[in-house]
């Protein structure tokens, strides 16, 4: 996915921010997720170029609820923006509450779709919002803006080590943030207003 020295960073290392930062120190790569052009052309969504396209991934894990998205907050956020020129594209393997499917500014990609298609869809959106999960981790290497919400009680010591006393990971650009706090409607709206076209 991420090119480095004429090759690619392994999927295992791409899922570790510590490993990515080591590689960044050594190679100073520029974030640029890449896929085979034929695959990307085949699997991306063909949406109106004039609208804001926001990829969203929310964690809804019934077995491990720590870090789950605050669905009421997200629903209210989407509802407030229902009559704007923004389309929120939900990716992931979770089933969302029925009321989410009734919002006309929400496009929910089938949970049966392959992971590769979801990643390509996410890459081709204008920015990304979501919970800290494996699927979100791939977006760390995108060159688009993103806000990822990490549960403040989920591995706090590891996260502190990853940041290494800094506010951001080494390879993150200006408009790429992992926020170690709970999502609120106010926070979501703040970054939506900042990143929208």
Go through each PLM region and give its residues.
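Active-site and donor-binding regions of nucleotide-sugar-utilizing enzymes
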Residues: 1-10, 93, 117-121, 135-137
């Amino acid at each position: 996915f991420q090119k480095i020295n004429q090759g690619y960073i392994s999927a295992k290392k791409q899922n570790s921010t510590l490993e990515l930062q080591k590689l960044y120190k050594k190679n100073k790569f520029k974030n640029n997720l890449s896929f085979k052009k034929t695959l990307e052309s085949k699997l991306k969504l063909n949406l109106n170029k004039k609208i804001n396209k926001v990829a969203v991934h929310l964690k809804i894990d019934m077995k491990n609820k720590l870090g789950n998205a605050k669905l009421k907050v997200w629903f209210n956020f989407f509802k407030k923006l229902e009559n704007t020129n923004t389309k929120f594209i939900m990716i992931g393997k979770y089933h969302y509450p029925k009321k989410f499917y009734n919002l006309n500014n929400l496009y929910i990609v089938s949970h049966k779709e392959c992971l590769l298609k979801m990643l390509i869809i996410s890459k081709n959106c204008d920015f990304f919002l979501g919970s800290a999960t494996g699927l979100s981790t791939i977006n760390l290497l995108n060159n688009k803006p993103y806000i990822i919400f990490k549960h403040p009680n989920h591995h706090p010591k590891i996260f502190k080590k990853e940041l290494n006393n800094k506010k951001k990971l080494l390879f993150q650009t200006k408009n790429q943030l992992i926020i170690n706090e709970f999502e609120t409607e106010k926070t979501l709206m703040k970054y939506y207003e900042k990143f929208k076209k």
